[in-house]
Amino acid sequence: MKIIGLTGGMAAGKSTVAALFRREGVPVFDADACVRALQGERGKALPLIGQAFPGTVVASRLDRAALREAVRGRPEALQRLEAIMHPLVRVERERFLKQCRARHEPFCVLDIPLLMEIGEDRRCDVVMVAEAPMGTRLARIRQRGRSGGRMSLADAKGLLARQMSDHERRRRADIVIRTGLSRGQAVRQVHALLHRLREAS
C-alpha cells in the first residue's frame, strides 16, 4: 500500500485536496477531525486535558476558548497539550493504516498539518504540500471567522508564525499543489499522481 502524506499551513487548502482524493475513492486519515473527536464529548483526551489545564473541561465538554487562553503565549503549555494529543492521534492513525491494509487498499492519504514536524513524512511514499498565497490564506481565515469560527486573525497569524515555513515544506515535498489557483489545476495534479502510482504498482 502506498501512503500519500498531505500537509500544508493553516488555510492552505489541505481539506480541498483531501476531498479530491476521497472523491477518487482513496481513504483519508484526517488528523484535524481526529483531534476534534478526541476532544469532543466523552472523547479520550478530555480527562487528560482537564487534569493538565484545570477549568478547561466543564460538564464533560471542552471549553475551547479557555484552552486557547491556557496555552496562548506559553510554549511549555502548548507542549504539554501536544504531549497529550499526539500519542492519542498516533493510536488512531495506526488503526486507520491497519484497516486500510486489511482491506488491501492500494493507496491511502495521511492528512496531517504537522506531518513533517512529527516525522511522519518519512513513512510516506509521496509527500504533497498544499500551498496558497498568504493573502489568500488570510482571506480564508477571515471568511471562517464570519462563518462562526472563534479564532481571531491575530491568533491565526500567531499560529502561522509558529508553523514550519512554506519554503521548508516545499523543499521537503515531492509535489506542491497550489490551491490558490483554479480548482481544476488541483484536480489535474491529484489525477496525475494517482495515475502515476497506479502505473507503478
Swiss-Prot record:
Q: Does the keyword ATP-binding apply?
A: yes
Give the residues the record marks as binding ATP.
A11, A12, G13, K14, S15, T16
Gene Ontology MF terms in the entry = ATP binding; dephospho-CoA kinase activity
User: What role does this protein play?
Assistant: Catalyzes the phosphorylation of the 3'-hydroxyl group of dephosphocoenzyme A to form coenzyme A.
GO annotation, biological process: coenzyme A biosynthetic process
Question: Could you give one GO CC term from the UniProt record?
Answer: cytoplasm
Q: Which residues form the DPCK domain?
A: 3-201
Gene encoding the protein: coaE
Q: Does the keyword Kinase apply?
A: yes
User: Which species is this record about?
Assistant: Gluconobacter oxydans (strain 621H) (Gluconobacter suboxydans)
Name the source's superkingdom.
Bacteria
- Recorded metabolic or biological pathway in which this protein acts: Cofactor biosynthesis; coenzyme A biosynthesis; CoA from (R)-pantothenate: step 5/5
State where the protein is found: Cytoplasm
EC number(s) from the headed UniProt entry: 2.7.1.24
Species classification: Bacteria, Pseudomonadati, Pseudomonadota, Alphaproteobacteria, Acetobacterales
Q: Which UniProt keywords apply?
A: ATP-binding, Coenzyme A biosynthesis, Cytoplasm, Kinase, Nucleotide-binding, Transferase
Q: Which Pfam families match?
A: CoaE
Protein's UniProt name: Dephospho-CoA kinase
Spell out the reaction equation it catalyses. 3'-dephospho-CoA + ATP = ADP + CoA + H(+)
Family per similarity comment: Belongs to the CoaE family.
Chief location bin: cytoplasm
Q: Which CDD domains does the record cross-reference, listed alphabetically?
A: DPCK
Q: Quote the InterPro entries the UniProt record gives.
A: Depp_CoAkinase (IPR001977), P-loop_NTPase (IPR027417)
